[in-house]
């Protein structure tokens, strides 16, 4: 639910002013939150199922595929470090006018 609210807030800000000040950092915050949450959930899922969950033919479901897709998303969307740098750079540039603090 938190990510959905962040995405709606970003979309609203973008629709009101596509070249607005906080568009870049709001997008980075959404991406960072989604990447971190997905990684945590997939790691916990793999821990619950143990080594058996990582086999492709696991009878418990597609644990291996979801974990692999999560890692691919982590690389595709940009490492969380890049997102954190973007957020911190823009926070310093704009001062303390940010709505979100991670």
Question: Where do the PLM segments sit?
Answer:
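Alpha-helical interface subdomain recognition
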Residues: 1-102
């Amino acid at each position: 639910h938190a990510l959905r609210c962040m995405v709606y807030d970003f979309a609203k800000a973008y629709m009101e002013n596509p070249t607005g000040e906080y568009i870049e950092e709001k997008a980075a915050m959404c991406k960072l939150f989604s990447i971190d949450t997905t990684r945590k959930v997939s790691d916990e899922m793999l821990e619950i199922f143990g080594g058996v969950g990582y086999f492709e033919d696991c009878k418990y479901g597609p644990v291996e595929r979801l974990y692999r897709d999560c890692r691919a998303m982590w690389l595709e969307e940009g490492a969380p470090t890049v997102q954190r740098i973007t957020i911190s750079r823009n926070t310093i540039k704009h001062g303390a006018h940010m709505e979100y603090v991670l």
